[in-house]
UniProtKB/Swiss-Prot annotation:
One of its GO terms (cellular component) is secretory granule. The keyword Signal does not apply. Residues 1-23 are annotated as: Disordered. Interacts with EXOC2, EXOC4 and EXOC5; may be part of the exocyst. GO terms for molecular function: SNARE binding. GO terms for biological process: exocyst localization; exocytosis; peptide hormone secretion. This is Exocyst complex component 3-like protein.
Length: 746
C-alpha cells in the first residue's frame, strides 16, 4: 500500500482547543513580565537596562517557540503511526473472519459425514463387547455357583473365605464393566446383597465380641480382619465406600449396651440397690474381659478398653437419666443411687480399680449425675426421710404417752432415777440419719441435719402439748393418772437426757448457734413441766393455806406441820430426778410454798390484838421459816438456794416494838426484795394492828424514799408473784396509793 493510499486512509485531524499547558505557561509569563515591569517603573534607574531585557526576552521567546514546534511535530508523527497500525489491524481481522467462515463450512460437512458412520461405530462397540464376553464367558458361567458358595460361607461364619470369594466376584464385575461400557450383567445383580449380608454377619460378630472372645476368638479376629481389609481398600470410581470399621465399632458399642442396659424396664421400687450391686460386679468383669480377651483380637487403633469404658459409662448415664425422668424414687433408692454414683462407681471397687489401666479412666467424662440430678435426689431423700422420721418420733411419743396412765409408776435405772428409752430412741433416730447422710455428701448431711433439728423441735412441741393434755385430763377427771407427778418428773429426766445428748447432733464446723432453737425448745419444755408440777403442788396445799394465818396458826405449829408433811409426801420422789434439774425443781417447789404462804398472809385474815400476839406471830414466822428450810434441806435443796428466809424479814416487821422505826425496816425489806410493792407492805403492816394512820403513811413513804437496791440484793421474783389483797379488812387500812390518799383525807 503506497503512501498516497495510506494518507487517504488516515482520518483528518480537526483543530481542537488550545492546550491548557500552553495557556497556563502564557499566564505565568505575563505575570512574571508584569512583575518585572512594575519593579522597573518603581525604580527609574533600571530603565536604562530595558533594552537588554527586551532582547533577552525575544531570544527566550524564540527558543520556546522552536521547542513547541518540535514537540508538536513529534506528536503528529506518533498519531500518524497509530492510525496506520489501526488500519493494518482492520485488514487482519477481516482476513481472520473469512478463514473462520470457511472452517465453519468444513465442519458442517464433516458432521454430516459422521452421521453416516454412526451405525458403523455401534457395530464396532458391539463387536468389542462380544469379544470381551467371549473371553470372560467361562468365568461368567461360574458366577451363580460362586454366589451360592459365598452365601454358604457367610451362613457358616467363614468370613475370610466368603470375603475372598466376594472380592473375586467383584473383580470379575469390574473386568466386565469397562468392556460393556458400564453395563451390569444380570448375573451380578445379587452381589451387593451378598456384600451387605457379609457386613451384617461381621457386625453381628462384633456385637457379640465379649462372648466370642471367650468362646471363639478366631471368629472375632476373622470378622475384624474382614472389616479392616474392606475399609482399607481403594473404592472403585462410582461405588459408595463401605466403612465396615465404623460399623464394627458401632456394633461393639451397641452389643455392649444391649448386654447391660438393653432392657427398657427400669428397676422396680426397692430393687434399685440390687440392680446397682449387680452392675458393681458386672462392669469391672466386663472391663477385665475387654482388656484380657477382646483387645488382643482387635487392632490397636480400636482402643478396646477405652471404648468399653466410655460405652459402659454413656449407657449407664443414659439409663440413670431415664430412671430419674420416671416416677419419684423412694428414700432407700435415692440414697443408694447417690452413694453408688458418687462413691462406689469411681471408687476402687469399680472404675477406679488399680487393676484397670489408664484407658479405663472415665473421671474426665460427663458425670453420671448432673448437679440438677443430685439436687433432685437429695430433695427426694430428705423429704421421704423427714416423713419417716416424723412418723417414728410420733410413734415414740405415742408409746411414751400410753404409759402415763399405767397403774404402776415410771421405770427406773440402776441409780433409782426415772428412766425411759424414748430420749435415746429419738436421738438415735436423728443421729443415725445424719450419719447415713454423711456417707453421701456434705450437702446431703447438712440438709438432713437441718431436717433433724426441725423435727426435733416439732417433737419437743408435741411432747409439751401432750403434757398439757395429760394435765388437763387429770385435773378435769377425764383420765385420772395414778402416778401423775412421777410421770411429770420422768418427763424432766427425758428433757435432761435430751439436753445432755443433743450435742451429738452438732456437725463439725457448723456454727455454734445451730442448736440454739432446739435448746430454746428444751428450756421451754422444762419450764412447762415445772409449771405443771408446781400447779399440782399448789392444788395439794391450797386447802391447808386457807386457814393461815389464824388464831390456831398462832397457837399451834400443827397447821404448818401439815403443810410440811404434805409437801414432803409430794416431793418424796424428787430425788429420782437427775441433777442439776432436781435442784432447780426443789428451788421452784420451795418458792411455790413460800409464795402460797405470803399470799395467805396478804389476805388480811388476821390482825394482832396486842404486843403479845405480834410477838407470837413473829415467833411463828421464825419457826415456820426454820421448819420450811429444814424440810427442803432434808429433800436435798442446797442451802444457798432457799427463799424461806423471806419470812424472817417479815418477822422483823411484826416484832418491832417501836413503830417509829418501821420506816427503816420497810426500807431494808425493799433493799432485800426490790419487787415488793406498797400494797404488799400495807397488807403486812395491817397484821400488826397497832399503827395509826400517820404511822402507816410514814412507813409507806419510807418505801418510796428507800435507796435503790444494792447489786447484791436478791433478784429472785417473789412479791411480784403474790397478788395484793383486793379489799382490806375493816380493822386494817386501805392498801396502796389509795390507802395513802384516804389517810391524808382523814
Amino acid at each position: 500500500m503506497d503512501s498516497a493510499a495510506k494518507d487517504e486512509m488516515q482520518p483528518a485531524l480537526s483543530p481542537g482547543p488550545e492546550w491548557p499547558e500552553q495557556e497556563r505557561a502564557e499566564q505565568l509569563a505575563r505575570g512574571a513580565a508584569l512583575k518585572w515591569a512594575s519593579g522597573i517603573f518603581y525604580r527609574p534607574e533600571q530603565l536604562a537596562r530595558l533594552g537588554q531585557y527586551r532582547s533577552r526576552e525575544v531570544q527566550r521567546t524564540c527558543s520556546l517557540e522552536s521547542r513547541l514546534k518540535s514537540v508538536m511535530q513529534s506528536y503528529l508523527e506518533g498519531v500518524q503511526t497509530g492510525v496506520w497500525q489501526l488500519a493494518q489491524a482492520i485488514e487482519v481481522v477481516q482476513g481472520t473472519r473469512e478463514a473462520l467462515s470457511q472452517a465453519r463450512g468444513l465442519l458442517q460437512g464433516m458432521s454430516q459425514a459422521l452421521q453416516t458412520l454412526e451405525p458403523l461405530r455401534e457395530r464396532v462397540a458391539q463387536h468389542k463387547q462380544l469379544q470381551a464376553l467371549s473371553h470372560l464367558l467361562p468365568r461368567l458361567r461360574a458366577v451363580p455357583a460362586a454366589v451360592s458358595h459365598t452365601q454358604t460361607l457367610i451362613d457358616g461364619q467363614q468370613f475370610l473365605e466368603a470375603y475372598v470369594s466376594l472380592r473375586e466376584l467383584e473383580q470379575l464385575r469390574e473386568d466386565t464393566w469397562a468392556p460393556l461400557g458400564g453395563l451390569e450383567l444380570p448375573v451380578f445383580q445379587g452381589l451387593d446383597l451378598l456384600f451387605e449380608a457379609l457386613g451384617q454377619a461381621v457386625e453381628a460378630a462384633a456385637g457379640a465380641a465379649g462372648k466370642l472372645a471367650r468362646e471363639d476368638p478366631a471368629l472375632l479376629v476373622a470378622a475384624v480382619r474382614v472389616a479392616e481389609v474392606e475399609t482399607g481398600r481403594t473404592t472403585p470410581l462410582g461405588q459408595v465406600p463401605r466403612d465396615w470399621r465404623q460399623r464394627c465399632l458401632r456394633a461393639l458399642q451397641e452389643g455392649l449396651e444391649q448386654a447391660h442396659f438393653g432392657s427398657p424396664l427400669l428397676p422396680a421400687p426397692g430393687a434399685l440397690p440390687g440392680w446397682l450391686e449387680a452392675l458393681r460386679v458386672a462392669l469391672p468383669v466386663e472391663l477385665a474381659t475387654a482388656e484380657a480377651l477382646v483387645a488382643p483380637c482387635c487392632p490397636p487403633q480400636y482402643n478396646v478398653v477405652q471404648l468399653w469404658a466410655h460405652t459402659l459409662h454413656s449407657g449407664l448415664r443414659r439409663s440413670l437419666q431415664n430412671l430419674l425422668a420416671g416416677p419419684e424414687l423412694e428414700a432407700a433408692d435415692a440414697f443408694a443411687l447417690l452413694h453408688w454414683a458418687l462413691h462406689v462407681y469411681l471408687g476402687q471397687e469399680m472404675m477406679g480399680s488399680l487393676e484397670l489401666g489408664p484407658e479405663a479412666d472415665v473421671s474426665q467424662l460427663e458425670p453420671l449425675l448432673t448437679l440438677e440430678n443430685i439436687e433432685q435426689l437429695e430433695a427426694t431423700f430428705v423429704a421421704n426421710i423427714q416423713a419417716s422420721v416424723s412418723q417414728w418420733l410420733q410413734n415414740a411419743l405415742d408409746g411414751e404417752v400410753a404409759e402415763w396412765g399405767r397403774e404402776h409408776g415410771p421405770n427406773t435405772d440402776p441409780s433409782g432415777s426415772y428412766y425411759s428409752p424414748m430420749p435415746a430412741i429419738v436421738l438415735q433416730i436423728l443421729e443415725e440419719n445424719i450419719r447415713v447422710a454423711s456417707l453421701v455428701s456434705e450437702s446431703l448431711q447438712q440438709r438432713v441435719h437441718g431436717m433433724a433439728l426441725s423435727e426435733l423441735g416439732t417433737f419437743l412441741r408435741s411432747f409439751s402439748d401432750a403434757l398439757i393434755r395429760f394435765s388437763r385430763d387429770h385435773f378435769r377427771g377425764k383420765s385420772m393418772a395414778p402416778h401423775y407427778v412421777p410421770y411429770l418428773l420422768a418427763a424432766l429426766n427425758h428433757k435432761s437426757a435430751l439436753s445432755s445428748s443433743v450435742s451429738v447432733l452438732q456437725l463439725d464446723g457448723a456454727p455454734s448457734g445451730a442448736l440454739a432453737p432446739v435448746e430454746a425448745a428444751l428450756d421451754e419444755l422444762q419450764r412447762r413441766i415445772y409449771r405443771l408440777v408446781l400447779e399440782a403442788l399448789q392444788a395439794e396445799l391450797q386447802p391447808l393455806f386457807a386457814d393461815l394465818p389464824s388464831r390456831q396458826w398462832l397457837s399451834s405449829p400443827e397447821l404448818l406441820q401439815s403443810v410440811c408433811e404434805r409437801t414432803g409426801r409430794f416431793c418424796r420422789d424428787f430425788w429420782r430426778v437427775r441433777n442439776p434439774t432436781v435442784q432447780l425443781l426443789l428451788a421452784e417447789a420451795e418458792r411455790a410454798v413460800v409464795l402460797q404462804y405470803l399470799s395467805a398472809l396478804m389476805q388480811g385474815r388476821l390482825v394482832c390484838r396486842g404486843a403479845d400476839e405480834r410477838t407470837q406471830a413473829a415467833e411463828r414466822l421464825r419457826h415456820d421459816a426454820a421448819q420450811l428450810q429444814q424440810l427442803f434441806l432434808s429433800l436435798g435443796l442446797e442451802e444457798n438456794a432457799h427463799c424461806a428466809p423471806v419470812l424472817l424479814a417479815l418477822r422483823e416487821l411484826l416484832n418491832l416494838r417501836d413503830p417509829a422505826l418501821l420506816g427503816l425496816e420497810v426500807a431494808g425489806l425493799r433493799q432485800q426484795f426490790p419487787d415488793v410493792s406498797e400494797d404488799h407492805v400495807s397488807a403486812l403492816l395491817g397484821l400488826r394492828g397497832d399503827l395509826s394512820r400517820e404511822q402507816h403513811l410514814a412507813a409507806l413513804s419510807s418505801l418510796q424514799a428507800a435507796l435503790p437496791p444494792s447489786p447484791r440484793a436478791s433478784r429472785r421474783v417473789l412479791f411480784s408473784l403474790v397478788p395484793a389483797p383486793a379489799l382490806a379488812p375493816a380493822s386494817c387500812l386501805p392498801s396502796g396509793s389509795c390507802a395513802r390518799a384516804l389517810l391524808l383525807a382523814e
